[in-house]
Every structure is written in structure tokens, then in C-alpha cells.
């Protein structure tokens, strides 16, 4: 199963919006001199996990590893599989186990900015 990848020095602000897939540790990359894997603006919104990490609790910043470093993320509507997050390492963990509305944060932001979701985007659904 695939999962999101976050390679060191590159990710600064990422919205993973209503995606379905795996959620596994150590699928990230980057030289240890270029950590963290992600800076402060990682948001997972309505993530439907099909393959969860067995680690409990799931940590975002591993002091015992050179290669697993995420600044505290925002996670809203994580569902599909059972996982226990270390909430002390998160900005926000809301509605875990449930889908939330708006279903797509990206589309809701477009609606607010543009007044509507563009037709080309609606045609992809």
C-alpha cells in the first residue's frame, strides 16, 4: 500500500486532503543533516487509512532516530484504521475515527476564495 512521502528540506506546507492509502513510518526520506522531514504546516484532512502503523503511540518526532522528524501536524478526520497518536506531538487531533465536513478542505477553501469550485475540478469526481 502506498503512503505519503515527506522528504527532508523540501516540505513546508502540505495539505493531504481526503486521501486513501497507507500510513506507515519510515517511508520518508532525506539526509539526517536535512531534517526535519516536514516543517510546521502539515495537515491531514479526512485521511482514510488502509494500512496503519503498528507503533503505539504513533510519534511524529522520534528522539531515538535520525530520520523520523516532523514538526507538530494538524490531523482532522483521520479514519479507516485504528491508531493511537501521541497528541503531545500534534498541533491538533480532531474527530479521529470520523469523517468531517467539509469533506474536502481544499474545495471549501476554493469556494470561499472564488465563490465556487471550478468546473474542471468537479469533473474529476
How would you describe each model-predicted region?
Residues 1-125:
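Extracellular parallel beta-helix/beta-solenoid repeat domains
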Amino acid at each position: 500500500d502506498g503512503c505519503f512521502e515527506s522528504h527532508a528540506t523540501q516540505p513546508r506546507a502540505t495539505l493531504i486532503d481526503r486521501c486513501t492509502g497507507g500510513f506507515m513510518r519510515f517511508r520518508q526520506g532525506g539526509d539526517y543533516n536535512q531534517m526535519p522531514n516536514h516543517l510546521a504546516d502539515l495537515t491531514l484532512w479526512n485521511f482514510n487509512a488502509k494500512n496503519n502503523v503498528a507503533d503505539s503511540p504513533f510519534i511524529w518526532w522520534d528522539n531515538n532516530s535520525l530520520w523520523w522528524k516532523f514538526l507538530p501536524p494538524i490531523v482532522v478526520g483521520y479514519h479507516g484504521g485504528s491508531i493511537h497518536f501521541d497528541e503531545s506531538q500534534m498541533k491538533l487531533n480532531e474527530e479521529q475515527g470520523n469523517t468531517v465536513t467539509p469533506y474536502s478542505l481544499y474545495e471549501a477553501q476554493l469556494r470561499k476564495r472564488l465563490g465556487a469550485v471550478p468546473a474542471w475540478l468537479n469533473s474529476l469526481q
